[in-house]
Amino acid sequence: MIQLPQKHASTGTSIFAIMSGLAQQHGAINLSQGFPDFPIDEQLSTFLEEGVRLGFNQYAPMPGLPMLRQAIADDFKRRYAVDIDADNEITISPGATYGIYTAFTAILQPGDEAIVFEPAYDSYIPNIEMNGAKAVPIPLTAPDFTVDWNRVKAAITPRTKAIILNTPHNPTGTIWSKADWDTLAEIVRDTDITILSDEVYEQLVYDGAIHYSVLQHPELRERSFAIYSFGKAHNNTGWKMGYCIAPPTFTQAYRRLHQFTSFSVNTPAQYAIARHLSSGTASNVRAIMEAKRDHFLSLLKNTPFTIHKPAQGSYFQLATYESISDKGDLEFAQWLTQEHGVATIPVSAFYHNRHDDKIIRFCFAKKEETLERAIEQLSRL
C-alpha cells in the first residue's frame, strides 16, 4: 500500500468546518462561520449573467481581467487616495486565503521565521509551516487585544523574514491605528522583513473609525503584500474571489507562483465585480454591517453573555460566558450548539497552543430574523 506523506496532519479539520458541521447535524443556527445568509446585491447577479452572455467564459489572463484590475485601482484611488499600477501591482486570486499562502510562499524559505499575532486566522501558521518556516506567535494584549511592541522587538531574529497582521482583526474586531503602522515601520526599517497585511475586512469599520491601509504608508508599502477579499465586501464568499496588491518586484514573485497553481480565476465573476465596482452603485456594506452589529449587541443584552468591547470592525463579536458556565470554550461552544441550537466559534482555536480565555466568537453577518432567532435561544440560558 502506498503511504503518502502526512503534510501538516497535526492540524486536523479546521474549527470552522467542525462547528458548521455540528450546526448542520443538530439543526442549529449558524453564527460560527463568517458568511452572510442574505442575498447578494441584485445588480451583481445581473452583471454575472451579463458576463456569461457576453462570452466571458474562458480563461482570464493570468493576472486577472484588465477591466477588474483597473476598477480596483480606481476604487483605491477614490477611497484611499493612493495610486496603484493596475498592470504591475494587482493580481486577482481565487480567494484571500490563497493569496496569503502564495505571498508566504514567495517570501519564505526553510528555516525562516514569520511573526504571527494571536489570536489569528487559523490558516496563517499552517501556511508558514508548509513552507518549511517557523511561526513565531505573539499574543495580543487582552482585553483590548493591542500589540505589545516590546515583545515584537524581542521576537525578531536574523531569521525573521515576515510579519503577518490582520486589520480589521478576526476574531477580535479591533483595528490598527496609524500609530501602530508607524511603530511597525520603525521596528522593521533596517531589516529585510516583509509585511503581509491581511485587510479582507477593510470596508467593515464602524463608529466613524477609518481603516488605515498599509498602502497608505509609503515606507511600509515598499515591503508589503496586501491581501483583500471581494467576498467580505460584496457578501459573496462562495465566489472565492480576492486580490493581492504589492510592489512590482513582489508582484512578479507572486505571479511566478500563481501561474503554476491557480493560473487564472473565474472569468464571469471577474467581469461581474469589475462592472459592479465601476458602476458607482455598489451597496454600502459598512452601513449594513454596522446596523447588524448594533442590532445584535442590543439583542445580546437579553442574554447572560458579557460584551467587553463592541467590535470596531469585521463582522464578528466576541463575548464571554463566565456567568453561564465554567466549561472550556471548545466544550462550551459544542454544548451551546448541541443543547441550545446556536453555533459559535471558540476563540482558543485561534491560538497555536489553544490558549483559553473562555471567549466565543459570534458572526453577526446574518438576516435580522436569524439573529433574533439565535437570541431567543440564547436568552433561555
Regions found by a protein language model. Give the residues of each.
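Active-site phosphate-binding strand-loop segment of PLP-dependent enzymes
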Residues: 136, 140-207
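Structural signature of PLP-dependent enzymes
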Residues: 56, 254-258, 277-298, 326-328
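Conserved glycine-rich beta-strand-loop-beta hairpin in the small C-terminal domain of fold type I
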Residues: 270, 274, 289-297, 308-321
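Conserved PLP-anchoring active-site segment centered on the Schiff-base-forming lysine
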Residues: 106-128
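PLP-dependent enzyme catalytic core of the Aspartate aminotransferase-like
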Residues: 153, 335-344, 350-381
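A short helix->loop->beta-strand "cap" motif at the edges of active sites that frequently abuts
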Residues: 112, 133, 190-194, 221-222
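Active-site PLP attachment segment
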Residues: 210, 216-253
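N-terminal small-domain helix-loop-helix segment of the aminotransferase-like
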Residues: 5-95, 102, 276-279
